[in-house]
From Swiss-Prot:
This is S-adenosylmethionine synthase. The keyword Nucleotide-binding applies. One of its GO terms (molecular function) is methionine adenosyltransferase activity. Belongs to the AdoMet synthase family. It comes from Ralstonia nicotianae (strain ATCC BAA-1114 / GMI1000). Mg(2+) binds at D18. GO terms for biological process: one-carbon metabolic process; S-adenosylmethionine biosynthetic process.
Amino acid sequence: MSNDFLFTSESVSEGHPDKVADQISDAILDAILAQDKYARVAAETLCNTGLVVLAGEITTSANVDYIHVARETIKRIGYDNTDYGIDYKGCAVLVAYDKQSPDIAQGVDRASDDYLNQGAGDQGLMFGYACDETPELMPFPIYYAHRLVERQSQLRRDGRLPWLRPDAKSQVTVRYVNGKPHSVDTVVLSTQHAPEISQEQIREAVIEEIIKPVLPSHMLAETKYLVNPTGRFVIGGPQGDCGLTGRKIIVDTYGGAAPHGGGAFSGKDPSKVDRSAAYAARYVAKNVVAAGLARQCQVQVSYAIGVARPINITVYTEGTGVIPDEQIAKLVQEHFDLRPKGIVQMLDLLRPIYGKTAAYGHFGREEPEFSWEATDKAQLLREAAGLAGEPVKAFA
């Protein structure tokens, strides 16, 4: 890729139907983990007009009212009126959970290669990524796409823009010059709204109250704004589209700036490496960049079901590393335990912490629950690499 280019990422709000499904799945996971931290959970959700379907595989000693959890999640998001197409009080909730297959459980409970550890819950490949485009070490486009829909939610909830409704989408196109974010080329923001508000009022409020307070002002000189481009967005949420768990995996991660292994996160307990290993790979990549070993870092790990140790740990810095990628990979293997149980212990994942992750991104957020965002191994990596002093930060 040329050093001068446009790159786009999108995000969606908590009221987007797929995110409603993700949040219900993770709320159920949290409710179970609060009682049984060793539960095996794969909670899938479908939501449509007036209907929620809960299915998947759960093995637990916990006693959870799944219907109540689903309704409370819908209420918290803001779907509390039948005019919105789904109302927490009156929607139908169907529950169809099975137990985890014993064939899978035997490989997870006792790894074939490591009797002191648990095996991976499935085969698969996972990626982690970090770069120095923002203080959070996230790609600029996805970071700000998240902040836009988060701002939409804040203004809806505090009543400053009372005509806003829960469903919204953002898209940020950034112009890169010499490989660094230079300016914001285009912002798309579509928000569900009350029927009586005019398009002109929506456009002015969205630009002045949502977009401009969020994006860096020095990057907006020639920005194009596309606000509700269809001209009307009254019908939204699960009424506008059927929502499913795990259908926003690029929104959940790096906005397309890094590869994705294909496995979704929400509703899965940390024995599922789709989730826990992706979190660990982000933790590794962020510490590599925070240590000043590279300006950007992509980490791939892969697993076989029932086997504890990763098949591979590969680091790629796209030529930005100050030491060879192979040397960074060796440091990662020495200082990070990427076996499933090692990840769980390293990041303290057997906690009911997942509800917050289900909207506005799993990465790049300074929340106390997000242990994978810590940079506590950066100095250790720097010293192990033989580098002196503190790393130089180079944010856009």
